[in-house]
């Protein structure tokens, strides 16, 4: 069935013509079509916005079928980054934005990518290697202020990242505790003497985005700093954030 992936570009073209910027690709019926196409046509390595990406066995349907994840956000990031920039990807997952950032900053720039979930981190490493980038520093760590002593959880039977969930919800039988290293972002970059060189931060951590910002106070003083945050109100509440 993988050979039938040649029909996916046709589907992408039709969807783009129909959507005309109205976000049709985010509607549930279209998402259902994505999942069905992904189920039948999924390949281990796919072309995603100019990069080769190794995918896990499940999840990341849009990567497999659309070849892009959020067209507006993607183009916005590309327009915000300059050659030679030092940028940060917090919650890098398997590397979609890490790869885009690595291409955008060029060989004289640097990307610092943080991903705490080990399964995703291993795929992230392979995707950087697959595309030959040498301007990326990978860290298998979560970002939080030093005074927070967190317990992270993995949600069983889901493909998302690990979650920081407040105590009264941790009795949920679908949650399993996960050990991961945690670091304060300011401390990390002060130790490298680069706290004043960061020009862009992308944050997507399934809830505790505010905690990431609290751990970045020195970096936030940079006058020309640009930030992209993916925020979910419900996940933020569950993180007590």
Regions found by a protein language model. Name each.
Residues 91, 114, 137-139, 202-206:
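Active-site-adjacent beta-strand anchor residues
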Residues 50-74, 134, 139-193:
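Glycine-rich adenosyl-binding loop in Rossmann-like folds that engage adenosine-containing cofactors
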Residues 92-94, 118, 143-145, 205-209, ...:
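Short, glycine/acidic-enriched loop or turn micro-motifs at the edges of active sites
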Residues 101, 124, 152, 212-216:
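Hydrophobic packing residues within well-ordered alpha-helices of enzyme cores
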Residues 187-241:
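Conserved acidic-Pro-Pro-aromatic motif
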Residues 96, 122, 148, 210-214:
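Short N-terminal helix/helix-N-cap motif within the alpha/beta-hydrolase-1
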Residues 1-117, 122-127, 131, 174, ...:
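S-adenosyl-L-methionine
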């Amino acid at each position: 069935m993988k050979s039938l992936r040649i029909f996916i570009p046709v589907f992408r073209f039709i969807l783009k013509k129909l959507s005309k910027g109205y976000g049709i690709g985010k509607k549930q019926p279209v998402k259902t079509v994505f999942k069905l196409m992904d189920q039948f046509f999924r390949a281990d390595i796919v072309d995603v916005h100019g990069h080769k990406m190794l995918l896990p066995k499940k999840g990341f349907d849009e990567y497999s079928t659309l070849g892009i994840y959020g067209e507006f956000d993607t183009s916005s990031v590309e327009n915000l980054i300059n050659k030679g920039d030092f940028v940060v990807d917090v919650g890098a997952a398997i590397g979609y934005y890490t790869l885009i950032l690595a291409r955008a900053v060029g060989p004289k720039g640097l990307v610092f990518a943080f991903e705490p979930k080990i399964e995703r981190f291993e795929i992230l490493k392979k995707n950087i290697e697959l595309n030959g980038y040498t301007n990326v520093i990978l860290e298998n760590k979560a970002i939080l202020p030093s005074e927070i002593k967190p317990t992270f959880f993995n949600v069983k039977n889901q493909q998302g990242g690990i979650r920081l969930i407040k105590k009264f919800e941790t009795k949920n039988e679908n949650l399993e505790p996960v050990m991961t290293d945690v670091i304060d972002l300011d401390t990390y970059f002060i130790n490298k003497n680069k706290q004043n060189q960061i020009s862009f931060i992308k944050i997507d951590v399934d809830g505790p985005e505010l905690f990431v910002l609290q751990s970045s106070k020195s970096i936030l003083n940079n006058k020309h700093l640009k930030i992209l945050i993916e925020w979910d109100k419900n996940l933020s509440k569950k993180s007590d954030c």
